[in-house]
């Protein structure tokens, strides 16, 4: 019913002056990622793997970025908080998390070819105690008005590519 994608975030004042993905590989940049045991952490590593194979961000990009990682956090909110507070120069988070922190962080887009899109399904449970209400919720979320609400919060709507 909705999808999410990765973005790189920097503190709002962006003291490291990061403007493009290549800047993450500069020596001395402090990066935080989520631990690989959580989906966003694995997706961040997938992005680096794709960038390494693609080559468009430069040879040795993955190793250079990983050398700049100062911590692996247990969840995406911790990554976002460390960046927003200026404890790190950059982090990789979901676009939906960055959207709700507008003003606290800046975003650097990750191209589709290097990104991983998380897909969230929706369904009513067969043993739901209120199947009619569950269906009404699904109908709303999948309708244009519901999709607009989700897009406002940084998600990719079901009909968008």
Locate the predicted segments by residue.
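Exported/periplasmic ABC-transporter solute-binding proteins
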Residues: 2-161
């Amino acid at each position: 019913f909705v999808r999410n994608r990765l973005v790189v975030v920097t503190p709002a004042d962006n003291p490291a002056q990061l403007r493009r993905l290549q800047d993450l590989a500069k020596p001395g940049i402090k990066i935080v990622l989520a631990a690989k045991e959580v989906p966003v952490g694995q997706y961040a590593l997938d992005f680096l793997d794709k960038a390494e194979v693609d080559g468009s961000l430069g040879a040795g990009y993955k190793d250079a970025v990983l050398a700049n990682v100062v911590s692996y956090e247990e969840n995406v909110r911790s990554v976002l908080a460390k960046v927003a507070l200026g404890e790190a120069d950059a982090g990789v988070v979901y676009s939906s998390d960055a959207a709700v922190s507008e003003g606290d962080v800046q975003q650097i887009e990750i191209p589709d070819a290097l990104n991983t899109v998380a897909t969230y399904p929706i369904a009513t449970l067969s043993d739901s105690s209120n199947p009619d209400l569950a269906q009404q919720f699904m109908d709303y979320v999948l309708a244009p008005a519901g999709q607009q609400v989700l897009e406002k919060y940084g998600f990719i709507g079901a009909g968008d590519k």
